[in-house]
Regions:
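Conserved beta-strand segments of alpha/beta enzyme cores
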Residues: 35, 86, 112-114, 207-210
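Mobile active-site "lid"/loop adjacent to the S-adenosyl-L-methionine
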Residues: 144-171, 175-178
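Short, low-complexity, intrinsically disordered N-terminal peptides in bacterial proteins
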Residues: 1-29, 126-134, 265-269
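Residue-level signal for inorganic ion chemistry
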Residues: 52, 172, 229
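SAM/dcSAM-binding transferase cores
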Residues: 221-269
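Conserved SAM/SAH cofactor-binding pocket of Class I
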Residues: 55-154
Length: 269
């Protein structure tokens, strides 16, 4: 699925059919503030998308772009939290991009959120044709594929969404740097054991890095890291106290529920 696409495919897909995704479920997130359709089979969004949205420090009047948006969970959650924010959802799969556009419409966000079917690694001209010119965004958010190729899912949709190819992270960050204005921020979620790879990939064009570890249970190891960095800025790395999703007994923590259910922002902002 990580194919190069031609410029005539880099189009707004809000009117395309969503039949190709097959049977869908409707899932409420953010305490019912969003209800999203997503395929029952293949990749399905989870906590990662909502945590990612909560970590983006966007404000009204700015523009955010989500790379690899799937059905739009993170970008739509961000748009729901930040009134007046313009969001573009970038998704390589036309059927999922169409479903993301449908989700924006169903949740009353279509005036501020649009979806385009576009490969994140497409050339500059293809992005510009899709309304994503260089230095045009204030924020880029992403949840890139991060699983090793030697441990792929047998499901092709899950495999495409989760398995990182050579230089996937570097390529996505290169595109983010191109799309962002000077001083714009990229925010991503990644495996905790891959933090060194993220920091290395960011070092070429980003600085002022902030890292928030995410723990599955209090007292346990981090399972994810949320990372924010600023284009063309230099400042020491800041490592924040981690967020535990559950206490030692497995009960959701109040801090996690505030983000996952109550649409609160995370301290990277």
């Amino acid at each position: 699925m990580r194919r190069q696409i031609e410029s005539d495919m880099a189009t707004d897909i809000s009117t395309r059919r969503t039949d190709a995704v097959g049977e869908c479920s409707e899932d409420a997130v953010l305490g019912g503030r969003l209800v999203l359709r997503q395929p029952r089979r293949g990749h399905r969004f989870g906590h990662d998308a909502i945590l990612l949205a909560a970590a983006v420090g966007a404000r009204a009047g700015e523009r955010a772009v989500e790379f690899g948006s799937g059905v739009g969970a993170a970008g739509l959650a961000l748009a729901r939290r930040v009134e007046g924010l313009d969001v573009t959802l970038v998704e390589i799969d036309p059927a999922l991009a169409a479903l993301a556009a449908e989700n924006a419409e169903r949740n009353g966000l279509a005036a501020r959120v649009r979806a385009v079917s576009l490969d994140v690694t497409a050339p500059r001209a293809v992005f510009a044709a899709a309304g994503l010119a260089s230095a045009s965004a204030d924020h880029v958010l992403m949840n890139p594929p991060f699983n090793a190729a030697q441990n792929p899912s047998p499901d092709p949709e899950r495999r495409a969404a989760h398995v990182a190819l050579d230089r996937t992270l570097e390529q996505w960050l290169e595109t983010a740097a191109r799309v962002l204005r000077p001083g714009g921020a990229v925010t991503l979620i990644w495996r905790a054991d891959g933090l060194a790879d993220v920091l290395t990939a960011l070092s070429a064009q980003f600085g002022a890095v902030v890292v928030l570890p995410i723990h599955g249970k209090a007292g346990g190891p981090a399972i994810r890291v949320l990372v924010r960095a600023v284009k063309d800025r230099s400042a020491p790395l800041a490592l924040l106290s981690g967020l535990a999703l559950a206490d030692a007994g497995g009960k959701p923590t109040a801090a996690a529920e505030t983000v996952l259910r109550d649409c609160a922002a995370l301290p990277l902002i």
